[in-house]
């Protein structure tokens, strides 16, 4: 195939006398011979040299890589106003292609501005572009964490490594991958991606190194926000988005949601807290219910405790603090219908937020449950209450009947933590529950500490927690339910990271913290039986064969986790003898 050399013409080069002139009489063979003579000293690629590009054969792979990097950058910088990299800008073909690519990549990622050395901790000789990270988020200890992508990545000369699963670690140096993590105590600089390779290109080939830099950038951005270094945080959040592109699966999704949340906090763009948002969350929760076992586990274990507490009762009443779409109650109604001696009269009071369109959605849920009750021959009473907050409830509103006539159970799934941002809110609700005098009070909450006073600690804990949750979703086949479930979790991340004060409602606490709250309010634990444990384990077998999920009994409570990390906890409570 012949080409007209005019279209490939570059700047004149004294090493090639005929280059840069329109000498149609010279043949390609002559040029190839001239290149061959020069190659004896420079080992230049023949075909590219004919076209006027000087590239050593040994540099071909690097040049190809840099071209890929430049192409990626050119697609990303349009909106940043870097006209010299815009796709519609003309660049004359350079002769020194390798150097030209280096210069272009350097322009895209210029050296960071001078900063106070007090931000650095043990920077050493590294020229890594993220050396402006404040505090110890990057340069902390020598025993840094490195992502264990495969055992083949370990060099033969490396020291032995110990493998462990992610738990409720709050150290800012731990890296969340959603999978197994390896602790490395040697060559820590290389492990955390601070190797002495060129820092100018932010398009990184090695996904493992990218993952390390990504998580450290997330931690550093959170630390900068806590220190009110918003200019550094702004620069880091942009790099987080760029680094996240190189990742796959759960890590990419988690990093993207956390990057959005960090950006909202930096620019003070709080997510909406409106009735429309409540309605959307309700819909998203339905998709989450269909996708994974967490809500099913919550409903099943709570129902089992309620069913046992109602044994032998002729009239029973459930007050549900988390009515939503009423997904929990068909299973309990069917179990009551099959009870030996016949079903009791079942009364249900559902409490939920107002609808965006002022429709009576709680009434609609009640009508559907009434149809089911009629079909299975259960006498059914229902009433719905609309409340902006559970703290607005009063026991007198609930039309309580004497305990000799009607046994009452109170149920709350993922609701009580939302009261912790309102002064006196949780105390008010627990006081109402005490007035109700239920035979059992079932509570399901996220098993994590997201309500501490220090932002960086909350951020670190939430990064671990949601990375594990997203990792557990990776085995689910792709579907609309899965996508919407990820959005459901992403909204929680956004609220937890971007909001403060009463707007921050995702204030999850651990079982021990809740136990202290309930104990000080006059409640004692009601242990869930071994039967609930066995049946919950059987339920999980329906999801991916139960692989990866784990049920654990802890002081009479049941925890569902992914591998060794507990994620949600079901507990049951009753009034202590003193009350």
Swiss-Prot record:
Residues 364-396 are annotated as: Leucine repeat II (LRII). A motif (LXXLL motif) lies at residues 416-420. The keyword Repeat does not apply. One of its GO terms (molecular function) is sequence-specific DNA binding. Residues 1-31, 149-183 are annotated as: Disordered. Pfam families: DELLA, GRAS. It comes from the Eukaryota. Keywords: Gibberellin signaling pathway, Nucleus, Phosphoprotein, Repressor, Transcription, Transcription regulation, Ubl conjugation. Phosphorylated. Ubiquitinated. Upon GA application it is ubiquitinated, leading to its subsequent degradation. Probable transcriptional regulator that acts as a repressor of the gibberellin (GA) signaling pathway. Probably acts by participating in large multiprotein complexes that represses transcription of GA-inducible genes. Upon GA application, it is degraded by the proteasome, allowing the GA signaling pathway. This is DELLA protein RGA2. The lineage of its organism: Eukaryota, Viridiplantae, Streptophyta, Embryophyta, Tracheophyta.
């Amino acid at each position: 195939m012949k080409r007209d050399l005019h279209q490939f013409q570059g700047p004149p080069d004294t090493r090639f006398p005929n280059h840069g002139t329109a000498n149609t009489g010279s043949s390609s063979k002559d040029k190839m011979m001239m290149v061959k003579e020069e190659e004896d000293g420079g080992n230049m690629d023949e075909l590219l040299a004919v076209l006027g590009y000087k590239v050593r054969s040994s540099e071909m792979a690097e040049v190809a890589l840099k071209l890929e990097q430049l192409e990626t950058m050119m697609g990303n910088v349009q909106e940043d106003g870097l006209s010299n990299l815009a796709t519609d800008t003309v660049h004359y073909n350079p002769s020194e292609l390798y150097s030209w690519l280096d210069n272009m990549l350097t322009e895209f990622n210029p050296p960071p501005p001078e900063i106070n050395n007090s931000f650095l901790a043990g920077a050493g000789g590294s020229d890594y572009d993220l050396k402006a990270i404040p505090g110890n988020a990057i340069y902390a200890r020598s025993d840094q964490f490195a992502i264990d992508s495969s055992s083949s990545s370990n060099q033969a000369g490396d020291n032995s490594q110990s493998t462990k699963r992610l738990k409720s670690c709050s150290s800012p140096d731990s890296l969340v991958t959603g999978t197994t993590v390896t602790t490395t105590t040697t060559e820590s600089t290389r492990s955390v991606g601070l190797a002495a390779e060129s820092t100018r290109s932010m398009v990184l080939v090695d996904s493992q190194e990218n993952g390390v830099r990504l998580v450290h950038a997330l931690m550093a951005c959170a630390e900068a926000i806590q220190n009110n270094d918003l200019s550094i945080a702004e620069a880091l959040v942009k790099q987080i988005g760029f680094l996240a592109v190189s990742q796959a699966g759960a890590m990419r999704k988690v990093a993207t949601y956390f990057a959005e949340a960090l950006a909202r906090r930096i620019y003070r763009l709080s997510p909406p807290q409106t009735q429309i948002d409540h309605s959307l969350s309700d819909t998203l929760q339905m998709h989450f219910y269909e996708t994974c076992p967490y809500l099913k586990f919550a409903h099943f274990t709570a129902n089992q405790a309620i069913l046992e507490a109602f044994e032998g009762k002729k009239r029973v009443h459930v007050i549900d603090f988390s009515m939503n779409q009423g997904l929990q109650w068909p299973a309990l109604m069917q179990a009551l219908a099959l009870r030996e001696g016949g079903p009791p009269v079942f009364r249900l009071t559902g409490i939920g937020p107002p609808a965006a369109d002022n429709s009576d959605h709680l009434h609609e849920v009640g009508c559907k449950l009434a149809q089911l009750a009629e079909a299975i021959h259960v006498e059914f009473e229902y009433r719905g209450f609309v409340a902006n907050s559970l703290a607005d409830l009063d026991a007198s509103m609930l039309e309580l009947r004497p305990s000799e006539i009607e046994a009452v159970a109170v149920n709350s799934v993922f609701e009580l933590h939302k009261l912790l941002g309102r002064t006196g809110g949780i105390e008010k609700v627990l006081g109402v529950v005490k007035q109700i005098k239920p035979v059992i009070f079932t509570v399901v909450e996220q098993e994590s500490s997201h309500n501490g006073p220090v932002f960086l600690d909350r951020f670190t804990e939430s990064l671990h927690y949601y990375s594990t949750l997203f990792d557990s979703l990776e085995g689910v086949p792709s579907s609309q339910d899965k996508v919407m479930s990820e959005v459901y979790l992403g909204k929680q991340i956004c609220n937890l990271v971007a909001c403060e004060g009463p707007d921050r409602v995702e204030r999850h606490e651990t079982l021990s913290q809740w136990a202290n709250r309930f104990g000080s309010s006059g409640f004692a634990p009601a242990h869930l039986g071994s039967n609930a444990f066995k049946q919950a384990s059987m339920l999980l077998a329906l999801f991916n064969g139960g692989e990866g999920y784990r049920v654990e009994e802890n002081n009479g409570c049941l925890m569902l986790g992914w591998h060794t990390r507990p994620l949600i906890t079901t507990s049951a409570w009753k009034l202590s003898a003193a009350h």
